[in-house]
């Protein structure tokens, strides 16, 4: 795929702690308790594995980032808009493109104008559903969905789906002459090679 959108607004399983504490000010024992108790509660509620985190109040530290993988967390979002459409360099310090109140339609139009699939643009919108009632602006997300929805050249994905796919891409191995491709991951991988669209199934060797 040449573009992707992360559904920050619809990703209800990303957790922010039991008490929404400012984690960088807490002892690490409290951080562990906050994350694991909230994970367990959400998993019991949804019947799914919760592997994402959003830093409450945007608060984190290098120590907290180092801790997260051992707690089953694969990625963590910060609330700092970048205005960019790039992949995260660090999944534990994942900055979105924009909040839904921050020039959303401008970013949508800019995103749709891109035509260089090799860059694999990522448009990440974040926000909270309660804000639409508070600000009386449901029309903002409705207009956005009308503009950007229903397109075949966009992959509409959750944070976890983007994270796991990009991790899987790193498990594609090539021969020195690039004639052989092997998908060592457990999911389908989409590639473009010499203008040809290639679908690599899990464990497949492409010749």
Predicted regions and their residues:
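Non-membrane alpha-helical structural segments and their capping/turn regions in soluble enzymes
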Residues: 28-33, 105, 135-138
């Amino acid at each position: 795929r040449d573009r992707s959108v992360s559904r920050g607004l619809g990703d209800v399983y990303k957790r922010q702690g039991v008490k929404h504490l400012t984690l960088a000010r807490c002892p690490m024992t409290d951080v562990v308790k906050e994350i694991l108790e909230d994970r367990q509660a959400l998993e019991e509620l949804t019947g799914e594995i919760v592997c994402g985190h959003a830093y409450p109040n945007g608060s984190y530290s290098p120590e907290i980032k180092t801790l997260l993988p051992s707690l089953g967390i694969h990625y963590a979002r910060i609330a700092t808009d970048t205005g960019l459409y790039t992949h995260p360099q660090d999944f534990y310090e994942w900055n979105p493109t924009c909040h839904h109140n921050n020039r959303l339609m401008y970013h949508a139009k800019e995103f749709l104008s891109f035509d260089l699939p090799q860059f694999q643009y990522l448009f990440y919108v974040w926000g909270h559903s309660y804000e639409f009632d508070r600000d009386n602006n449901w029309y903002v997300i409705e207009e956005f969905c009308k503009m950007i929805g229903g397109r075949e050249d966009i992959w509409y994905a959750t944070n976890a789906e983007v994270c796991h796919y990009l991790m899987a891409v790193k498990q594609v191995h090539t021969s020195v002459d690039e004639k052989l491709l092997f998908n060592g991951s457990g999911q389908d991988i989409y590639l473009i090679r010499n203008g040809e669209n290639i679908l690599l199934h899990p464990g497949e060797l492409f010749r």
